Each structure stands twice: as C-alpha cells, then as structure tokens.
C-alpha cells in the first residue's frame, strides 16, 4: 500500500538509507558540508539566484520567508485553512508578530480579485498588508492546485500593490 497522506509518514528505502550513509558530510555551521553546499548551489543555479538556503522542514522555511518579508504589525493574506495558519503553532504571530487576514478560497485557492479586495488601505489604525501566502497543493483543500494563470494574476496584483508573494509548496 502506498500512503500519500503526508511526507512525514514515509520511510526511506534501503537505497535511500545507503545513499545517506555514504554521503560526504561536514559541519554545516561552518559551511563544511559538501552535500548541503552542493544542494544549495544547484538550487541557486536552477532559480537564477546568487545563493540558496537548505532548511530541515517546510515549517521552518515558511517561518523564515514570513519573517524576512514582513515587519512586526504587518498583515499576511492567506486562506483560512492555510498550513502557515493552522499547523505551524501560531508561528507567524509569534516569530514575526504579524496578523493573518484569513480569506475563504475555493478549496483553499485564493483569486487575484479576492486578494485585491482584501488589501488594507493606508490607515494608521490598520496593519499594513505586506505579504500574500499561497499554498500549492492545498492540504486542507484535498490537494487542490492553483491554475498557473491565476498565480500570474495574483503575482501581478502583488507587484502592483508592492506586496511580497510566498508559495508554500506543501
């Protein structure tokens, strides 16, 4: 039986375990781990970026992305069932001191129009909308995926309104 409920349920195969056992290792704190360095270099090259950072979990990756793209008292637009809201222990509120604006998408998928209508006006009494966080595939949406053209429209809304866009690749 193949169990696809979560990546946390799977176990490595004997071949995977052998590859891990045989992999060259070093202290990543001192950037001495050749396996991690090679992975980061390949990912940076793939995305045309000067550098990449390997994180041991999706939750850590999401929390870093939220923190570097927001300031305390900012607002993050996401679906009400988003992993970053439901399953990360309140991390965005604790680590980044931001407020979530929870929208109700179709199986968790937001639209460009929904996002545009949800951006706060410039008002001292309201948090600054700073980040839009999407999830693809949408866990609580039964694995629903975004239409690529909708992502392009969402990115356009974000660019027009000077918002950052984060994609949780759950």
What are the functions of these language-model segments?
Residues 23, 129-138, 165-170:
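Short beta-strands and strand-loop turn motifs
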Residues 6, 31-32, 53-56, 78-79, ...:
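General beta-strand structural signal in soluble alpha/beta enzymes
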Residues 50-69, 103-104:
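Conserved core of the PLP fold type I
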Residues 160-161:
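Helix C-cap/helix->beta junction micro-motif
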């Amino acid at each position: 039986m193949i169990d696809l409920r979560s990546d946390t349920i799977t176990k490595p195969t004997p071949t995977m375990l052998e590859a891990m056992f045989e992999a060259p290792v070093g202290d990543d704190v001192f950037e001495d781990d050749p396996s991690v360095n090679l992975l980061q270099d390949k990912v940076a090259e793939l995305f045309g970026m000067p550098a990449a950072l390997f994180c041991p979990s999706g939750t850590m990756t999401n929390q870093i992305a939220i923190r570097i793209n927001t300031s305390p008292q900012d607002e993050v637009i996401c679906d009400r069932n988003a992993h970053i809201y439901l399953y990360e222990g309140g991390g965005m509120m604790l680590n980044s001191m931001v407020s979530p604006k929870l929208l109700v998408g179709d199986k968790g998928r937001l639209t460009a129009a929904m996002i545009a209508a949800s951006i706060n006006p410039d008002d001292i009494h309201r948090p600054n909308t700073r980040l839009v966080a999407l999830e693809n595939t949408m866990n609580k949406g039964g694995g629903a995926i975004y239409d690529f053209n909708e992502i392009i429209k969402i990115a356009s809304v974000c660019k027009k309104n000077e918002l950052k866009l984060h994609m949780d690749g759950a």
